[in-house]
């Protein structure tokens, strides 16, 4: 690293497996304290960073004081992805009133007593939604009260916005970042916004956020053409992005292959998409297809009631058994016409709209749909209700098997294989259609920007998936830190700690990756 191998100190709160650590270590950061309450995540952290992390922040920062396991030196940068579950769309929304939500105040105790020079806090997108307006303003007010210059507008960013040379990965993962710089005490009256009555003004915007979802960057280093993530020619392509690599060893602790019934569901919907494409010359439209709504037509309902649909047969295909479509549909099984049902006008508008489009679709294609449902046994126990739904968001992808899919409670969602939706800490692992398998734990680690040498040991694959779903993206953190230092450079120059941070973080171009580091520091 240039500039005399500049270094700065940081503490890593709610550290997980070390996403913040990976980003900061790549720019000269030296971790002095890390804390993570999850035993499995803390073990992975220590395995890779040679730094004990297992512990409870409430033991180290509370009303009695701040100990940080004996570290009493300067803190140049404080990072923390404080617990997201109360705010996340992936789970029930209960807000900061939940016990773990109050852990922000343990962060605040460290900030109050130790006065880190720079703060980088991360949370889910919902933190800045209308349901959490009070919590957001409380956080901003607290930081300003402690003497920090912080934007009142959130920095919202996602790794798919960055081209690969800047550390981007093909994953839409919108996260909120709160970045702040400690203002020298003599300057606080002019830098910290206050109301006319002299109180801290939490609603004032202050400096601009360091990143937004509208930011765009050059496709190539030094170039002028901008990178657009969804562009068909120059945007992301999951299959050629480097996330999926030929020759990767097969993981020993997880079977990535699809089950027979999972393959059946995809084969069936793939057949319907192909059937409609042949009939119309167009792919499916982009709305949710609900097979159960078609049974509102009395002609199809009668066939379901009399158990006219049977499960398809299984045959050996390659080295595995696979369901194959039936070819024995009785003559006259398909009705000559269908009767459109009325829509209950008391239903929510969105549901009426979906039903109307499904009824239109079935009226136009009932002959093809009934024959399709017979071939695959769609109205049998092989298809639970959630698998009788398809959310086609793949535009003109040639086949369902050419998409990236997710099995969700709302149905099978299909997207073009450009970039993936956010990894989550629950069981919605992406299915890569062209490979007929799920993403591997190693591939999810690449999506989060972790280096190839990063080692999860022999832990359960489910634990790795969970950790990746809870983690921060390394490239995004590095970008956020760099942009923060650029924005606040004049303020940081005023202190020795700030100068250390500038010299380290701005020493190298953003393509200097953590992969050059060894696991030991």
Curated annotation (Swiss-Prot):
Keywords: DNA-binding, Methyltransferase, Restriction system, S-adenosyl-L-methionine, Transferase
EC number: 2.1.1.37
Catalytic activity line of the entry: a 2'-deoxycytidine in DNA + S-adenosyl-L-methionine = a 5-methyl-2'-deoxycytidine in DNA + S-adenosyl-L-homocysteine + H(+)
Gene Ontology MF terms in the entry: DNA (cytosine-5-)-methyltransferase activity; DNA binding
Keyword Glycoprotein assigned: no
Pfam families in the cross-refs: DNA_methylase (PF00145)
Domain SAM-dependent MTase C5-type intervals: 8-491
Keyword Signal: no
Biological process annotations from GO: DNA restriction-modification system; methylation
Catalytic residues of the enzyme: 84
Record comment regarding domains: Replacement of residues 191-272 by a single Ser residue still protects DNA against digestion by AluI.
Alphabetized PANTHER family for the sequence: TRNA (CYTOSINE(38)-C(5))-METHYLTRANSFERASE
Name of the molecule in the record: Type II methyltransferase M.AluI
Gene source species: Cellulosimicrobium cellulans (Arthrobacter luteus)
Gene this protein is translated from: aluIM
